[in-house]
A protein has these predicted regions:
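A glycine-rich phosphate-binding loop feature that marks nucleotide/adenosyl-phosphate handling sites
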Residues: 146-151, 385-388, 561-563
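Short hydrophobic beta-strand segments
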Residues: 193-197, 379-383, 450
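Active-site nucleophile and cofactor-binding loops and adjacent substrate-binding regions
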Residues: 21-32, 47-54, 119-120, 226, ...
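Active-site diphosphate/adenylate-binding microenvironment
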Residues: 1-5, 11-12, 333-437
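Thiamine diphosphate
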Residues: 10-15, 83-99, 249-251, 301, ...
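N-terminal alpha/beta PP-like core and its mobile active-site loop of ThDP/TPP-dependent enzymes
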Residues: 1-318, 323, 376, 441-443, ...
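Generic recognition of flexible, low-complexity loop/linker segments
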Residues: 131-132, 180-183, 208-209, 243-245, ...
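Phosphate/pyrophosphate-binding active-site segments
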Residues: 119-122, 159, 184, 274-384, ...
Length: 573
């Protein structure tokens, strides 16, 4: 704070090189926001937290950043290591003893690409660059630095270093033999499937994967994560976001896995006998996962974008115009019909209720109306958990960079993550010259389950949104509780005791429900638009109002009580 105040006083009115500071009253939201910013820009932001307790406040946001390969830099203080005034910065407060723990970085080290300590101010720039090198090298993720007050107060001579020699590792490609093996496998297969996970983080990979799917007519593409837009929804080769299982995976005679952590779940999705599996990615062995393996005949450590370009180049030279040959031409034609049938099935799920003035909307109907009402440039931030597949199938996103998901298991990401995405979109729209280019970027919509919404600390999220002028639309899918635990239980005990009782009996119910939109409105100083949608007719009235509110510069929060939840009681209606 002393350095910030000094920089402010020294400022002559010109552009400052000092970082822009954004105040976030909760560490989890702060790191989720930095995570969301990095998803769109690839640029790591720095999150400052207070010693061990602030580090713990980051919570599962560290897990999310690590799993989702999102580069961030976290800096935390350490309790002073002198107590009798030996150095400037020595202990001056009671709390300095209580926050002195044996190994502070151990709290988060297993989630970090680097965890280290400033031991002198004389090489602080080198240490920061070392941390950023590792955070921005694949697989990307968080870096953690800490330093005691004595080090922060150390007097040093001003010095410069050459920033051009501190870049991360350049992306690597496939070997020539690997390229030939993969192409041969896909071309010779009768039922090839490509499964992706993180490829869309680099937006340039999306058209490259489309080119590959066009060059091998008949191949199907599955996104097994939904963390980014990896493939356009409207393409005939696309199956969609499918987590853990799909009939096409079980039927495949060749599977190419590209940058994906969990392409299928063996207990839920048995594979065909003799299927040939090839895995490509920056971390094919998943070195931070103690238990992970798939029966791949070949594994290649390579960047998805580089690898896809190599595969396309080889195909264009060795196997041009397969679509004009049989059996590929027939497969290509069949895909068009198959995809049309899949979309028609999703359309049927999005049909309005028979009594729209009294019946709640389904998640599918809700999201189909969102797609029609929100602007074409909308970026969707999804954390819908048990409703996620319905959401993806109705939003039907085609544009790279316009679909983002937390990717990890630390629910609540989307609150801060959505603000980070909005901040990044405004920043990119301003030519990457200014953080806080208010409202210039894309329209941003968060779709979140009710339990996950509470995990996201909405009291902090909507205060930050108001202070820094980051208006977004939030849709809370209100189904009166956590349904994901019931699904998990019934996968193991499909006919057990738990399957026979209510969510209330399982202690996963939110009855009586909180005022979800009211929480956000209060946190925004009563400036946000808020509404509760109880029926399909309500939805058609409220959605345009909410979109207009966001476009006017204020946040909008809708609690949508979706069909399929247990009956709403009189005191909740």
């Amino acid at each position: 704070m002393e350095a910030l105040a000094g920089e402010t006083r020294r400022s002559t009115g010109g552009p400052s090189k000092f970082p822009k500071v954004i105040t976030v009253p909760h560490e989890f939201v702060a790191l989720s926001m930095a995570d969301g910013f990095a998803r769109l820009t690839g640029k790591p932001q720095c999150v400052l937290v207070h010693v061990d307790v602030g580090t713990q406040g980051l919570g599962c946001a560290m897990h999310n950043s690590s799993i989702a390969r999102s580069p961030v830099l976290v800096f935390a203080g350490l309790s002073p290591y002198t107590l009798e005034g030996e150095l400037r910065g020595s202990r001056t407060e009671y709390i300095h003893w209580l926050q002195d723990v044996p190994d502070q970085k151990a709290i988060v080290a297993q989630y970090c690409r680097f965890a280290g300590e400033f031991k002198t101010g004389k090489n602080v720039k080198q240490m920061v660059n070392r941390a950023l090198q590792l955070a921005t090298s694949d697989p990307k993720g968080p870096a953690y630095l800490m330093g005691a007050r004595e080090v922060m107060e150390e007097e040093i001579d001003e010095y410069d270093i050459d920033q051009e020699v501190w870049h991360g590792i350049e992306p690597a490609g496939l070997s020539p033999a690997g390229v030939e093996n993969i192409v041969s496998t896909l071309v010779q297969a009768e039922r090839p499937v490509i499964i992706v996970g993180y490829t869309g983080r680099n937006h340039a990979t999306v058209p490259l994967l489309v080119q590959l799917a066009n060059a091998v007519p008949g191949v199907r593409v599955i996104d097994a994560l939904g963390s980014d837009l990896c493939f356009p929804f409207s393409h005939r080769a696309y199956i969609g976001v499918r987590i853990g299982k799909h009939a096409a995976i079980s039927a495949a005679d060749a599977i190419l896995v590209i940058d994906c952590d969990v392409p299928w779940i063996p207990t839920q999705c048995p594979l065909a006998k003799g299927v040939k599996i090839i895995e490509v990615g920056v971390d094919p062995l998943k070195q931070n996962m103690p238990l992970h393996y798939i029966p791949a005949s070949h594994r290649y450590k390579a960047d998805a974008g580089v690898a896809l370009q190599q595969l396309n180049d080889f195909l264009s030279s060795k196997h041009p115009a397969l679509v004009q040959q049989e059996p590929y031409a027939a497969r290509w034609a069949a895909l068009e019909q198959t995809r049309a049938e899949e979309i028609a099935a999703a359309d049927r799920l999005a049909a309005p209720p028979s009594s729209p003035d009294t019946d709640a909307a389904s998640t599918s109907y809700l999201c189909s109306q969102l797609r029609k009402t929100c602007p074409d440039n909308t970026i969707w931030c999804i954390e819908a958990v048990s409703n996620a597949m319905f959401v993806y199938d109705q939003l039907r996103v085609d544009k790279p960079g316009h679909l983002v998901n937390g990717g990890g298991g630390g629910l609540g990401w989307s609150g801060g993550g959505t603000l980070g995405v909005k901040l990044a979109s405004d920043y990119l729209a301003n030519g990457e010259s200014q953080i806080g280019a208010e409202g210039k970027g894309s329209f941003v919509c968060e779709i979140v389950g009710d339990g996950t919404y509470l995990f996201g600390v909405p009291s902090t999220v909507y205060w930050v949104a108001r202070r820094y002028k980051l208006p977004t639309l939030t849709i809370v899918l209100s189904n009166k509780g956590w349904n994901a635990p019931r699904i998990s239980m019934e996968l193991v005990h499909p006919k057990g005791h738990g399957s026979q009782v209510s969510n209330e009996d399982l202690n996963i119910s939110f009855s009586p429900t909180p005022d979800f939109s009211g929480i956000a409105k209060s946190a925004s100083g009563n400036t946000a638009y808020s509404a509760v949608v109880r029926t399909a007719s309500d939805l058609l009235r409220v959605l345009p109002e909410a979109v207009a509110a966001v476009q006017s510069g204020v946040s909008a929060i809708i609690e949508a009580r979706v069909h399929g939840s247990s009956p709403w009681k009189g005191d909740e209606a």
